[in-house]
Curated annotation (Swiss-Prot):
Principal place of residence: cytoplasm
Name of the featured protein: Cysteine--tRNA ligase
Known EC number: 6.1.1.16
Residue ranges annotated as motif 'HIGH' region: 33-43
GO biological process, one term: cysteinyl-tRNA aminoacylation
Binding site for Zn(2+): 31, 215, 240, 244
Binding site for ATP: 275
PANTHER family xref list: CYSTEINE--TRNA LIGASE, CYTOPLASMIC, CYSTEINYL-TRNA SYNTHETASE
Domain of life: Bacteria
Family under the similarity heading: Belongs to the class-I aminoacyl-tRNA synthetase family.
Record-level Gene Ontology MF annotations: ATP binding; cysteine-tRNA ligase activity; zinc ion binding
Length: 499
């Protein structure tokens, strides 16, 4: 495990050595999506960055427990359900399914646990009751608010000073509720029931939880009072993460998280990409446009996770070119192993670099060390990518020759060095979640590729959820005509195979 791993901690505003609470173990909580719509590129950036963090920690020898939530009850979900004439549950389930499909397409490892707010209601009610008993919360006309003036540390994450602030900190509370608050920054822990909205029983009357208390309760339930790392986008520093800290620490008297990491925003034309501004592009639309998942990963990882990421055609083109070269190098062992006389093995262990010449050993050891040094330096993914491109250069040249039909021309020592170089490239690429993509081509009897089939299955699932069974049957019949058989499994899962 690296002793030199350092992170820039939003809480302390310093880049610090990382030391987990328990040696060799890391507990991580990542704020998930509010499931009212499809995910956009901004979400992709967050979850690609944190996927790489998780992969690097695992590769470095840590046992990682990674928890990421779904916010499945929220004003935005209720608004979408009302617009569709649907239910909160239907909107949530549809978008949770879509989230999984998008993340799987991007090669993002699924979290170890994915709690939902609606399945953590008992923990939420318990936490609110504890805050009320300690004088940190108060009731007002069926609502319950957190009293920010009762928590001395409020503002320590965002740097906000309560004395200078006159606007509310809830982020999702209407102006009409301000009169009931003791301070403008007080935020809702429990919202009293409203006509026509789902509600749940509580000691304060029927209602539903506020946004921030959900995460505090899920962190506590899944990982305990104090965790190693808390993740999210920079837009969550205030109010969401500030409020999480306040309510959790007021209840437990313990530090919520040792390290807070926040990724920068994706910008379009100088503005943050967001659904509210209407300047967003969904992950699904990008992939359906022909952009490969690995190109999208490379685009994200070319920038440091804390810096803004400009979404431009030129940046995507550069990522496409870069991935084409890396993919060609990664393909060597799969496409040309016989011509090279290679017997590809599993990726090398973290310390196992073997070559027949000392210069080759030095080259590969240096590459591994520089990769680790970059990642240890606050997840410098662009520096790590530079090592991958350096490793790939002679492999890409060899791949180009083989594609032209030129016979390989190297002695045994050269061949061994190239094999070890390829194995190391494959290993380090996997740490960044980069995997070989074969060129698109007609597959067996069908011209449909896997991504198109999965998209059709998603469309069929949505049709069934909307009770448009005629459309669902049409999609099944269309796939069947192209040799694709669908197998529906319990839990709404659909598998497929080529007939």
């Amino acid at each position: 495990m690296p002793v030199s791993l350092r992170f820039t901690n939003t809480l302390t505003r310093r880049t610090e050595p990382f030391q987990p609470l328990k040696d060799g173990q890391v507990s991580i909580y990542c704020c998930g999506v509010t499931v009212y719509d499809l995910c956009h590129l901004g979400h992709a950036r967050s979850y690609i960055n944190w996927d790489v963090l998780r992969r690097y920690l695992i590769w470095s020898g840590y046992a990682v427990t990674f928890v990421q939530n779904f916010t499945d009850i929220d004003d935005k979900i209720l608004k979408r359900a009302a617009e569709e004439g649907s239910s909160m549950e239907a909107v949530s389930e549809r978008n949770i399914d879509a989230f999984h499909a998008d993340m799987d397409a991007l090669g993002i490892l699924r979290p170890d646990r994915m709690p939902r707010a609606t399945r953590c209601l008992e923990g939420i009610r318990t936490l609110i009751a504890e805050l009320e008993a300690k004088g940190a919360a108060y009731s007002a006309d069926g609502d319950v608010y957190f009293a920010v003036m009762k928590h001395a540390g409020y503002g320590k994450l965002s740097g906000r000073d309560l004395a200078d602030q006159q606007t509310n900190a809830d982020g999702r509370v209407a102006d009409a509720e301000e009169a009931r608050k003791q301070h403008p920054f007080d935020f809702a822990l429990w919202k009293g029931a409203k006509a026509g909205e789902p509600s749940f029983p509580s000691p304060w009357g029927n209602g539903r939880p506020g946004w921030h208390i959900e995460c505090s309760a899920m962190v506590r339930e899944e990982l305990g009072d104090t965790i190693d790392i808390h993740l999210g986008g920079a837009d969550l520093v205030f109010p969401h993460h500030e409020n999480e800290i306040a309510q959790s620490e007021a209840a437990t008297g313990q530090e919520l998280a040792r390290v807070w990491l926040h990724n920068g925003m994706v910008n379009v034309g100088g503005e943050k990409m967001s659904k509210s501004l209407g300047n967003f592009t969904t992950i699904r639309a990008l992939l359906e446009s022909g952009l490969s998942a690995m190109t999208l990963r490379l685009f994200v990882l070319q920038a440091h996770y804390r810096k803004p990421l400009d979404f431009t055609a030129e940046a995507l083109e550069a990522a496409t070119t870069g991935w084409k070269g890396l993919n060609a190098a990664l393909s060597l062992g799969d496409l040309h192993a016989e011509a090279l006389g290679w017997t590809p093995a599993e990726p090398m262990g973290n310390d196992a670099v073997v070559a027949s010449e000392s210069s080759a050993i030095d080259t590969l050891l240096s590459a591994r060390q520089r990769f680790s040094a970059a990642m240890d330096d606050d997840l410098n993914s662009s520096g790590a990518l530079a090592v991958l491109f350096e490793l790939a250069r002679p492999l890409r040249a060899l791949a180009n020759r083989l594609d032209r039909g030129d016979a390989p021309n190297h002695n045994d020592d050269d061949g061994q060095e190239l094999l070890q170089r390829w194995l190391l490239l494959r290993e380090l690429a996997a740490v960044l979640g980069l995997r070989l993509e074969h060129p698109s081509a007609p597959e067996e009897e069908s011209d449909l590729d896997s991504q198109s089939i999965e998209a059709a299955i998603d469309a069929r699932r949505l049709a069934k959820q909307s009770k448009d069974f005629a459309e669902a049957d049409r999609i099944r019949a269309e796939l069947s005509a192209q040799g694709i058989e669908l197998i529906d499994k319990p839990g709404g899962i659909t598998e497929w195979r080529r007939g």
